[in-house]
Amino acid sequence: MNVEIERNFGEQPIAGIMEGHGLKAQDLVSISTEQLTYKMVYRACKGRRLTLNVKSKIRDALNKSIGEEYSMEELFTY
């Protein structure tokens, strides 16, 4: 069972949204009430495969920081 799992999906829409609002990874980490790390945010922007739980934490922190409601489909292409 040597099934190759796609891990890199290229830059994600969340990177453009964060840039448009002038946000950095530090902003999401500091506003999050959940355990969120810089590495998780960087991986999300770069397009590394993340678990649903991590994507939810990032979405919640982003929505809280800008006061808008983005869905998973708007932030991630996978």
Language-model regions, residue ranges each:
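Residues in the helix-turn-helix
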Residues: D27, Y38-M40, E74
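DNA major-groove recognition helix of helix-turn-helix/homeodomain DNA-binding modules
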Residues: N53-Y70
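DNA-recognition alpha helix
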Residues: Q26-Q35, D60-S65
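Short amphipathic recognition helices of helix-turn-helix/homeodomain-type DNA-binding modules
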Residues: N2-V3, E69-Y78
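A short, Lys/Arg-rich alpha-helix, primarily the initiator
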Residues: M1-V29
